[in-house]
Regions:
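Helix-to-loop junction immediately C-terminal to a conserved catalytic motif
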Residues: 48
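The feature captures the beta-strand-to-loop junction immediately N-terminal to the Walker
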Residues: 33-35
Length: 232
């Protein structure tokens, strides 16, 4: 389980994250919703150690990781798919996926795990194509596949539907549901697309101005008025 307690972050004179506390449990999809500029991506960067937290603690599977560097968090079983995907455009699809195996020994990192191609068949069909030649939706699938290649216990996704065609959004949603159903991974999904989040969420969190202003179970999102809270 991911446990975040009283997390604060500042940027210049601005108080970006204001005492955030929440949990993301193994076997559940925790959806974090909020409008642009409320601090969602800053929170994820703190969780991955890209930006150090100024105050508060982050624990993963009972152990404090607040002081861990990003690569240490990867080795602890945490994977992050950022906005913009950050794939390697000049590398092939297969080479991009092999990059996700960097936390394993050379012997274990020789081949792309078969389960990646089972989740995303298009990646196997295009494994010799350069990443930069893929469509936006295919690049997003590649970015998620690369993250999953590290066999994480916590998968963090930052707005995976942004700029993606509806058919691929459905495919990504189906993959997230499959991963959650296995029950051995916590998934933290940051999303602005309400319907996508509502379909997947076991737990929801709503951020506004650096604070979590509402939280609850996914099945009560509509009754709790979450759609109105995140409407742009």
């Amino acid at each position: 389980m991911l446990n975040v307690e009283n997390l604060h972050q500042y940027y210049g004179g601005s108080h970006i994250l204001r005492g955030l506390s929440f949990e993301a449990k193994i076997g559940e999809v925790t959806c974090l919703l909020g409008r642009n500029g409320v601090g969602k991506t800053t929170l994820l960067k703190c969780l991955m150690g890209v930006i150090p937290a100024k105050e508060g603690t982050v624990k993963w599977e009972g152990k404090p990781i607040t002081g861990f560097k990003p690569h240490q968090r990867v080795h602890a079983g945490i994977a992050y798919v950022p906005q913009g995907r950050e794939i390697f455009g000049r590398l092939t699809v297969e080479e991009n996926l092999l990059m996700g195996l960097s936390r394993f020994s050379a012997k274990e990192a020789r081949e792309v795990p078969e389960f990646i191609y089972e989740l995303f068949p298009v990646l196997e069909q295009m494994k010799h194509r350069r990443g930069g030649d893929l469509s936006g939706g295919q690049q997003q699938q590649l970015a998620i596949g690369r993250a999953l290649a590290s066999r994480p216990r916590l998968l963090i996704l930052d707005e995976p539907t942004e700029g993606i065609q509806p058919s691929v959004i459905k495919e990504i949603g189906a993959v997230i549901q499959k991963l959650a159903a296995k029950g051995d991974m916590a998934i933290l999904l940051v999303e602005q697309f309400y319907d996508f989040a509502a379909e997947l969420a076991d737990q929801y969190l709503v951020m506004s101005r650096g604070e979590i202003v509402q939280q609850g179970r996914g099945e009560t999102m509509e009754a709790d008025g979450v759609r109105g809270l995140v409407a742009i």
